[in-house]
């Protein structure tokens, strides 16, 4: 081996790099207003009351396995809103809005990780799409729930989430981080 040659030994398997906005940058770009804050805060309080059996309604978190198309999600949301109105005395309906795929080792990784469904992994675009969809749902007066898979994801969207879950398979990831 030549003595004067530079050998690259760092990040030898990285093909591409894309900028991911810092959470505060995206929150400043897509802020929530007082009405959305009121919806999220109020729904969190209602969920707490239901879980502590101080509210007789049933909490229903319902929606698709994962979101891949915001327009379809909004169409689904409009149907849920009708049910939320019809059953408001018996149910508190929260739309399940999962953006990441926890059990997928191959294939699509979810809207946040691969918003274009083509393995380009434009995470910056994905977190922006996720945040915008949540704002649109809140403007429809529909609370949203999601599963948090990685410690960074909540930093972008937790202010618009009324109900959150950490899946059984994901606990170790939070501990390791």
Language model: regions and residue ranges:
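Active-site-facing alpha/beta catalytic cores
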Residues: 2-11, 90-177
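N- or domain-start disorder-to-order transition segments that initiate the globular core
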Residues: 10-54
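N-terminal beta-rich core of secreted/periplasmic extracellular enzymes
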Residues: 36-49, 81-94, 100, 130, ...
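Glycine-rich anion/phosphate-binding loops
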Residues: 67-87, 120-132
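A short helix-to-beta-strand connector/capping loop
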Residues: 55-56, 89
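Short glycine-rich or small-residue beta-strand-to-loop segments that form or flank ligand, phosphate
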Residues: 57-68, 94-98
